[in-house]
A protein has these predicted regions:
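Non-heme Fe(II)/2-oxoglutarate
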Residues: 1-84
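A short glycine-rich, His/Asp/Glu-containing loop-to-beta-strand
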Residues: 83-104
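Residues that flank catalytic or metal-binding motifs in active/ligand-binding sites
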Residues: 95, 114-116, 163
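Long, contiguous binding/interaction regions
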Residues: 97-99, 126, 151, 163-165, ...
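Short, conserved beta-strand element in jelly-roll/cupin
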Residues: 101, 112-128
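Short beta-strand His + acidic residue motifs that chelate non-heme Fe in jelly-roll/DSBH
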Residues: 108-111, 128-130, 139, 148-160
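A short hydrophobic beta-strand segment most commonly corresponding to one strand
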Residues: 118-121, 145-147, 161-177
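A short beta-strand-loop-beta hairpin characteristic of the jelly-roll/cupin
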Residues: 121-141
């Protein structure tokens, strides 16, 4: 996984123009024939947050039809991620599949997403923590696949001094009990 990540980063660096400090992404799949589907806010995606003391929930960004993301990006087809994508697609109905970077000593907002997420940690450190519904967990980079209920309020923060990079996929058919 690390070798594949390094290959992708040599082909295309992280898109840091997503409007969220210390966060970046690279899309591994796209809407067939639509290279614009992997740019800008489409890498980030829609989410809901409660940004201030009123506690009022607001939506950020435009909704994305995740089910349209079914074509692996051509320039990454020679990486191990193409194999991983094909294997995961046999088990799950996937939406966008991305490499997501959380830079050292940084955090996201407390937010929720429209669907669960599949995480495969690639680069991490003990200070990189995922918090879902007030439960904190470090996801080690040991090859495991984690399904997180991102429809609940959650956060990812990197309290370490090294980058945190996960392969993250939107899972469209997964139901939590």
């Amino acid at each position: 996984l690390r070798k594949a990540c390094d290959q992708v980063l040599k082909i295309k660096g992280f898109d840091t123009s997503l409007g969220i400090p210390h966060f970046a992404g690279i899309s591994l799949n796209q809407i067939p024939g639509d290279p614009d589907s992997v740019k800008g806010s489409k890498v980030r995606g829609v989410y809901w947050t409660r940004p201030d003391s009123t506690g009022k929930e607001v939506i950020r960004d435009s909704k994305i039809n995740e089910s349209l993301y079914s074509e692996f990006v051509q320039e990454f087809k020679d990486t191990y991620f193409h194999y991983v994508y094909k294997e995961l697609s046999k088990i799950f109905k996937l939406g966008r599949v991305r490499l997501l970077l959380k830079e050292p000593r940084s955090t996201l907002s407390w937010h929720r997403d429209p669907e669960p997420r599949l995480h495969i940690p690639i680069y991490t450190n003990p200070g990189a923590i995922m918090v879902v519904d007030s439960i904190a967990k470090h996801l080690p980079a040991d090859g495991s696949v984690w399904i997180t209920n991102n429809t609940k309020y959650h956060n990812a923060f990197n309290g370490g001094e090294e980058d945190r990079i996960h392969l993250v996929a939107c899972v469209l058919d997964y139901k939590f009990n």
